[in-house]
Curated annotation (Swiss-Prot):
A Pfam family hit: BacA
Further details from the record: Bacitracin is thought to be involved in the inhibition of peptidoglycan synthesis by sequestering undecaprenyl diphosphate, thereby reducing the pool of lipid carrier available.
Catalytic activity: di-trans,octa-cis-undecaprenyl diphosphate + H2O = di-trans,octa-cis-undecaprenyl phosphate + phosphate + H(+)
Protein name in UniProt: Undecaprenyl-diphosphatase
A cellular component annotation (GO) from this entry: plasma membrane
Transmembrane segments: 5-25, 43-63, 84-104, 109-129, 184-204, 213-233, 248-268
Family the UniProt entry places it in: Belongs to the UppP family.
Originating organism: Sinorhizobium medicae (strain WSM419) (Ensifer medicae)
InterPro entries in the cross-refs: UppP
Keyword flag Cytoplasm: no
PANTHER family in the cross-refs: UNDECAPRENYL-DIPHOSPHATASE
Length: 268
């Protein structure tokens, strides 16, 4: 197993874990890293399986909360309403994602220029929304009404365009509809769980014939890197956005997108 392949796997896993849950688009960063730095994914199954590291990271960090919600379901109307809200928010992306999976993967994911432009546009939008003098009406994810959750889920569908960011779309939508920054980020975490598990299962099924024991070392390296980085981000993000908002992520998006466009122009 070549050292370069291991380094590529670790870098891609690290990028996946660091960017999956923040509003900068993990897909854009992984694809642009592959395009400009030569860190090529060992295969479609590698890209799918390192996402499992990020999924397990958020499930581990939120295990106690998830267990408390599950135990409260038989007796708590609030817990049942919250679960319903998350499922309603998940539904639009599940339906559209399953129907448009082939087009998204084969067409949109192969367009680096589109990804860079979307990074910049999304960064500008996130910056403007973060600076708006909005008055929050919802500060606790357990108080989100199902109708609000469904609207946030519709925003999540925008993330099917590479470079948009799943968390960025849901957070922007939530802020515009009256949530505070911390709860918007936390609801994005909860919504990520069924969304990422569903996307992982669909991608794994679509690529089932490409599974190979030969790539197990590379997959393990990327998986572990994504898992460790994901834990760090999930544990620190809520406090970060409570104090600093989303402007740093907006600026990062604009810088990465601009650098990507310049790189594409220079490379012809």
């Amino acid at each position: 197993m070549a050292d370069q392949s291991i380094i590529s796997a670790l870098v891609l896993g690290l990028i996946e874990g660091l960017t999956e849950f923040i509003p900068v688009s993990s897909t854009a960063h992984v694809l642009l890293a592959g395009h400009f730095l030569g860190f090529r994914s060992p295969g479609n199954t590698f890209a799918v399986l390192i996402q499992l590291g990020a999924i397990l990271a958020i499930l581990l960090v939120y295990f106690q909360k998830l267990l408390s919600i599950a135990l409260a379901l038989p007796t708590s109307v609030r817990a049942r309403r919250f679960v319903l809200s998350v499922l309603l928010a998940f539904l639009p992306a599940a339906l559209i994602g399953a129907a448009a999976h082939g087009f998204i993967k084969s067409v949109l994911f192969e367009t680096p220029m589109l990804i860079c432009v979307v990074l910049i546009v999304g960064g500008i939008i996130l910056y403007v929304i973060d600076r708006l003098p909005l008055t929050p009406r919802y500060t606790d994810v357990f108080d989100y009404p199902p109708s609000l959750a469904l609207k946030i889920g519709l925003f999540q569908c925008l993330a099917m365009i590479p470079g948009t960011s799943r968390s960025g779309a849901t957070i922007a939508g939530a802020l515009l509809m009256g949530t505070d920054k911390r709860s918007a980020a936390e609801f994005s975490f909860f919504l990520a769980m069924p969304t990422m598990v569903g996307a992982f299962a669909l991608d794994l099924y679509k690529n089932r014939e490409a599974l190979s024991i030969d790539d197990i070392g590379l997959i393990a390296a990327g998986f572990i890197a994504a898992f460790i980085a994901g834990i760090f981000v999930v544990r620190s993000l809520l406090d970060f956005v409570s104090h600093r908002g989303f402007t740093p992520f907006a600026i990062w998006r604009i810088l990465v997108g601009t650098a990507g466009l310049v790189g594409l122009w220079l490379l012809g």
